[in-house]
Curated annotation (Swiss-Prot):
Transmembrane segments annotated in the record for this chain: 13-35, 45-67, 74-91, 95-117, 137-156, 166-188, 220-242, 252-274, 281-300, 305-324, 345-367, 372-389
Source species: Brucella anthropi (strain ATCC 49188 / DSM 6882 / CCUG 24695 / JCM 21032 / LMG 3331 / NBRC 15819 / NCTC 12168 / Alc 37) (Ochrobactrum anthropi)
Pfam family, one: MFS_1
GO terms assigned for molecular function: transmembrane transporter activity
Protein name: Riboflavin transporter RfnT
PANTHER family from the UniProt entry: MAJOR FACILITATOR SUPERFAMILY PROTEIN (PTHR23534:SF1), MFS PERMEASE (PTHR23534)
UniProt superkingdom: Bacteria
Topological relation to the membrane, as annotated: Multi-pass membrane protein
PROSITE patterns: MFS
Keyword Repeat (UniProt): no
Family: Belongs to the major facilitator superfamily.
Length: 398
């Protein structure tokens, strides 16, 4: 089997694994706040389960990178899938016991699983070179398109399957998804890496030096902005929808449209990046996120919520995939593990904070305030991105 064939095989496997693994977050996001409302006596804590999911994602990135480095991606990913199965069982147990604490432990554990799933996009680039990196990332993210349908539909199909424990069935289905991922991940094979004999002991630059690189800082900032703003608005959306008189099914379908929009562009995002460049597509993503806030501020009908969530998802896709591709240009193969791990730790740590503050801010200030905050944060990253593009344009004209 040639390296190219092995790489394509791994992309297919990772895409299927992504479809299964990425079906879990929509369940947590759709129901985390609603279950929080039932189990928590403090309205400010209703989004804590979703925040802990994102915190688990952030805290899990560095251990996941360590396990991948020590035991290989396949073994680490299978461990992650087992953790995902356990997470669903724990969350369901919390609902059965009417325990907010146990339920939160389940969503935190689900975040640990998500930290492995998030790195599938980097695993796809292990044997890719040049422009193929962006396409490899993009194709693995296509698995999320299936997840966009499976996750929310599981919520609708299973939310009342156990009458005395509303939503417990949905989290048990989450456990099944983790178990189904195990045989898929078992087929993953690490690509052969041709090592430079002169670089056997090369560990690359110290992490501190990488973190101080302006290029790395901008790449991480773009990813953080795209993901944190998406999570900030998305976490508040289901609660805001129900609060404005819409049904739980409407809220779940809103998340489904949102997640579909997050992953559907992946069919062509890689090609767009190849044609127009990483920075331009990332900037376009940020503009679309700002546009989603404009739609959200237009009213409280189902159409306003769904329209905002759809453009928020498309903006996330361009911003996140573009920023991920930017990060892969900021490190050598020897620096890959620590650079990618640091990127995800910073990004998902910020995402955890964003999801937590979404709940308290929604309770204290309302849905409009959530969306007004999008504009200054987008501007903070969009301006440096545009300034980075200007010299290239000037050089091209000269």
């Amino acid at each position: 089997m040639t390296d190219a064939t092995a790489a394509r095989r791994n992309i297919v496997i990772l895409t299927i694994a992504q479809a299964l693994g990425a079906s879990s977050p929509p369940i947590v996001i759709s129901l985390g706040g609603l279950v929080g409302q039932k189990l928590s006596s403090d309205p400010a804590l209703v989004t804590l389960p979703v925040s802990l999911f994102n915190l688990g994602l952030a805290l899990g990135t560095l251990p996941a990178a360590f396990f991948m480095r020590q035991f290989g991606r396949r073994n680490a990913y299978m461990l992650g899938a087992l953790v995902g199965a356990a997470a669903g069982v724990i969350a369901a147990a919390g609902i059965f016991a009417a325990s907010f604490l146990i339920f939160c432990l389940g969503t935190l554990t689900a975040g640990f699983y998500a930290s492995y799933v998030q790195s599938y996009r980097f695993a796809a680039t292990d044997a890719a070179t040049g422009d193929m990196k962006a396409r490899a990332i993009s194709w693995v993210m296509v698995g999320g398109l299936v997840a966009a349908i499976v996750g929310p539909q599981l919520v609708i199909w299973t939310r009342d399957t156990i009458p005395d424990a509303m939503f417990a069935g949905s989290f048990l289905s989450q456990a099944v998804l983790g178990l189904l991922a195990l045989p898929v991940l078992f087929m993953l094979r690490a690509p052969k890496v041709r090592k430079d004999p002169n670089a056997i002991h090369d560990t690359g630059r110290p992490l501190g030096e990488i973190l101080r690189s302006p290029r790395f800082i901008l790449s991480v900032a773009a990813g953080v902005c795209s993901y944190a703003l998406m999570t900030f608005v998305m976490t508040a959306a289901p609660i805001a929808m129900v609060g404005h008189g819409h049904s739980v099914d409407h809220a779940a379908l809103g998340i489904q449209w949102h997640v579909l929009a997050m992953f559907a562009p992946s069919f062509f995002t890689g090609k767009l990046i190849t044609r127009f460049g990483k920075e331009k597509i990332t900037a376009l993503g940020l503009v679309l996120i700002a546009f989603s806030a404009i739609i959200a501020l237009g009213g409280f009908d189902v159409g306003h919520f769904w329209g905002a969530l759809i453009f928020l998802g498309i903006g996330w896709n361009f911003g996140f995939i573009g920023a991920t591709a930017m990060v892969t240009d900021c490190h050598t193969p020897a620096e890959r593990g620590k650079a990618q791990g640091a990127n995800d730790f910073i990004m998902f740590g910020t995402v955890a904070c964003a999801s937590f503050f979404a709940g308290s801010l929604l309770h204290s200030s309302g849905w409009e305030t959530i969306n007004w905050l999008v504009f200054p944060i987008v501007a903070l990253v969009l301006v440096p991105l545009i300034l980075r593009l200007k010299p290239k344009g000037a050089a091209a004209e000269a």
